[in-house]
Curated annotation (Swiss-Prot):
One of its GO terms (cellular component) is cytoplasm. It comes from Ruegeria sp. (strain TM1040). The keyword Cytoplasm applies. Monomer. This is 3-phosphoshikimate 1-carboxyvinyltransferase. 3-phosphoshikimate binds at residues 28-29, 33, 174, 176, 327, 354. The active site is at 327 (proton acceptor).
Length: 450
C-alpha cells in the first residue's frame, strides 16, 4: 500500500524497552542499481537480499518492460537476464515508477542514449518532484524530453539515436543525477566525465567497476572527477545486497530514546558516503557501537548496537556531512528532540525537494508534539526537550513520505504521550516489514483506521 492508496492512520506509544535483533531490509540504492546494471549486462546476474519494497519492485517491472528477463526466486533471491549495453527494447506501455525518485531518474539515464522512446509517470508525490536536474544533462547526450510544466512527470524521453559523450559538472550534490549521467554514458562512444564538487554516495561507481566498466574516480581541486569509457560489455555479477543504513536508522534511533533499550542491527552497509547519521549520533553522545566490521561485495559492513542514551547533547551537524545522511535528517530531528540543548542542521536545501518538503513536514509534526523548531531556506534547528521530555500527543501529516511517517512512529516510542501520523501507507515503499520488525523489538504501533 503506497501513497496512491487508501490512507492508513497509525499511532505509536511508549511500551516496553526495545530488545533483540532487528534484521532490516536490503539497501534500496544498491537494489535499484543491481536490477538496472543487471539488465544492461550480457547474461544472468544473481541478486540476494534484494529490498522487496514497492520502489524496487517498480524498477524490476521497468527492466522487464525494456526487454530484460527478471525472475523472482523467492526469499530475496532474484535473477536478471540482461540485454547488454544499448540493447534496451522500446516499452509498449507507460513506465510507472510509483514513489521512487531513484528508480525513475536512473532508468531515464539508462535509456536516454538508446534510439527508443519511453514515457514515465509516478504517484502523486513523485509527479511533483523536479526532473529537469536529470533531463538537462541527458539533453547534452542528444536525448529529448517533454514533460509537464516545471520539468515534472508524466514525461516522455526520446533517446539519442547517435549519442555523444558528455562532460558534466553536477550543480547540486545528487547521487541520482550523477548516476543517471553515468548510466547514459554507458552507451555513448568515448569518455563521459562527471564532476562533483561535493562527494555523494558512490554505489554506482563501485558497481559499474564491479560489472566490468572502465571507470576512474579522482579527487582533484575542482572536486571528484569520474571518467567512464562508453560502450563496454558489462559482465553479469553475483550480488549480495547489504542491509540498508537508511532503514537501520529507525530501530537504532528508537533504541536511543526508549528507556532500557538494547538493540542489535546486524549486517548494515557502512559506505562512508551513507553513514553520516551514525557518526552524528556518536558526536551527540549516543551509546552506539560498530561491531564485527567487515567487507562484503566491495562495501564496508558492520553490526550496529544501540542502547538507551539519556545523556545526548544537541550539536551543530557539519554541513559537509549532509550528502552522507540526507535521508536521515527527519529521524535525526526526532532524536534531537530527546537531547539536551539545540541541534542545528545546515546545508540541507536538498531536503525541500525530496518525497516531501522534509524540513517543512518535520517542523510541523515536531511542533504538533510539543517541540520547538526554527527553520530557514537551507537550515533548521531543534530545541531538545531532554531525555523523556518530549510531550507527544499530536498527529503529524506524513505528506506521502515514508521517512516522515516512520520518524514520527519512532518519536511515539519515547514520548510521554502517543504520537500519530495521518497516513502510514507510504512506509511500504522502502520498509514493508517496519511495523512487524519494530513490534518484535517491543514497540507498540497500531493502525487506527477504524
Amino acid at each position: 500500500m503506497s501513497g496512491h492508496g487508501t490512507p492508513i492512520p497509525m499511532t505509536s506509544r511508549r511500551a516496553s524497552p526495545l530488545k533483540g535483533e532487528a534484521h532490516v531490509p536490503g539497501d534500496k540504492s544498491i537494489s535499484h542499481r543491481s536490477l538496472i546494471l543487471g539488465a544492461m549486462a550480457v547474461g544472468e546476474t544473481k541478486i540476494s537480499g534484494l529490498l522487496e519494497g514497492e520502489d524496487v519492485l517498480d524498477t524490476a517491472k521497468a527492466m522487464q518492460a525494456f526487454g530484460a528477463e527478471v525472475v523472482n526466486h523467492g526469499g530475496g533471491e532474484w535473477s536478471v537476464f540482461g540485454v547488454g549495453v544499448g540493447g534496451f527494447a522500446e516499452p509498449e506501455n507507460v513506465i510507472d515508477c510509483g514513489n521512487s525518485g531513484t528508480g525513475v531518474r536512473l532508468i531515464m539515464g539508462a535509456m536516454a542514449t538508446s534510439p527508443i522512446t519511453a514515457t514515465f509517470t509516478g504517484d502523486a508525490s513523485l509527479n511533483k518532484r523536479p526532473m529537469a536536474r536529470v533531463t538537462d544533462p541527458l539533453a547534452l547526450f542528444g536525448a529529448q524530453s517533454v514533460g509537464r510544466e516545471g520539468g515534472r512527470l508524466p514525461m516522455t524521453i526520446v533517446g539519442a539515436a547517435e549519442p555523444v559523450p558528455v562532460r558534466y559538472e553536477v550543480p547540486v550534490p545528487s547521487a541520482q543525477v550523477k548516476s543517471a549521467v553515468l548510466l547514459a554514458g554507458l552507451n555513448a562512444p568515448g569518455k563521459t566525465v562527471v564532476i562533483e564538487r561535493e562527494a555523494t554516495r558512490d554505489h554506482s561507481e563501485r558497481m559499474l567497476a564491479g560489472f566490468g566498466a572502465e571507470i576512474t574516480v579522482e579527487d582533484t581541486k575542482e572536486g571528484r572527477v569520474i571518467t567512464l569509457t562508453g560502450q563496454p560489455e558489462l559482465k553479469p555479477q553475483v550480488i549480495a545486497v547489504p542491509r540498508d543504513p537508511s532503514s537501520a536508522a529507525f530501530p537504532v534511533c528508537a533504541a536511543l530514546i526508549t528507556p532500557g533499550s538494547d538493540v542489535l542491527v546486524p549486517g548494515i552497509g557502512l559506505n562512508p558516503t551513507r553513514a553520516g547519521l551514525f557518526y552524528t549520533l556518536q558526536d551527540m553522545g549516543a551509546d552506539l557501537t560498530f561491531e564485527n566490521p567487515r567487507t562484503e561485495g566491495g562495501e564496508p559492513v558492520a553490526d550496529l548496537r544501540a542502547k538507551y542514551s539519556p545523556d545526548m547533547k544537541g550539536i551543530e551537524v557539519p554541513p559537509e556531512r549532509a550528502a552522507s545522511m540526507i535521508d536521515e535528517y527527519p529521524v535525526l530531528s526526532v532524536v534531537a528532540s530527546f537531547a539536551t540543548g539545540t541541534t542545528m542542521m545546515a546545508g540541507v536545501k536538498e531536503l525541500r525537494v525530496k518525497e516531501s518538503d522534509r524540513i517543512d513536514a518535520m517542523a510541523k509534526g515536531l511542533r504538533a508534539n510539543g517541540v520547538t523548531v526554527e527553520e530557514g531556506e537551507d537550515w533548521w534547528s531543534v530545541e531538545g526537550c531532554g531525555p523523556e521530555g518530549v510531550k507527544g500527543g499530536g498527529t503529524a501529516e506524513s505528506f506521502l513520505d515514508h521517512r516522515i511517517a516512520m520518524s514520527f512512529m519512532v518519536m511515539g516510542m519515547g514520548a510521554q504521550n502517543p504520537v500519530s501520523v495521518d497516513d502510514g501507507s507510504p512506509i511500504a515503499t522502502s520498509f514493508p516489514i517496519f511495523e512487524r520488525l519494530m513490534g518484535d523489538l517491543g514497540a507498540s504501533i497500531i493502525r487506527t483506521d477504524g
